[in-house]
Amino acid sequence: MKIFKEQQRFTQTWLIILLAMSIIVPIGIMIQEYAKENTKMTTNEFLLTLVGILVSVLFIFFFKLTTRIDEKGIHYQFFPFHFSLRRISWSEINSVNVRNYDPIGEYGGWGLKGGSLWNKAKGKAINISGDIGIQLTLKNGKKLLIGTQKESEAKRVLDTYKNKII
């Protein structure tokens, strides 16, 4: 019995740099305002605003995509949107394959994507980084793409369970 497990987080260097640069200006303006002699900003307001900015930016690092493939099906969780693993059993799947995709062109970027605002024909995507995903087409017609950084391992385990797709 083969099992595929993967956990991904938003840890890309470019994202960290972008987020750091995006908070420099607001924090700089806030510090400058607080440092003025006749400021109306209290210490509590300053600290609360500073913590608010930092927490809102750092929140993205709590996101985690967990994927598991086993004899029961394909399980996924995108925390904080899903608090537990969601399972798609093999009997619900019409087809599954690992493929390259264009995150921005096909789904509008990374994260929990798809639905009414983007290309409905592509279905939904749950991804953290990269351009490789596990593409599922379900028997009810819905499509789901789950991003992966472990292409060969995912293919190997999926090949083991393809006979379970009826």
Q: Where would I find each of the regions flagged by the language model?
A:
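ATP/adenylate-binding site constellation spanning eukaryotic-like Ser/Thr protein kinases
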Residues: 71, 90, 151
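Hydrophobic alpha-helical transmembrane segments
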Residues: 39-51
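Non-transmembrane, membrane-adjacent beta-strand/coil modules in membrane-associated proteins
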Residues: 77-142
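Transmembrane-cytosolic junction motif
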Residues: 57-73, 77-78, 83
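Extended, compositionally biased eukaryotic interaction scaffolds
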Residues: 53-55
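N-terminal membrane-targeting/pre-transmembrane regions
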Residues: 1-41, 123, 142, 157, ...
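Short aromatic/basic micro-patch
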Residues: 68, 87, 145-148
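A membrane-cytosol interface segment of integral membrane proteins
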Residues: 3-4, 118-166
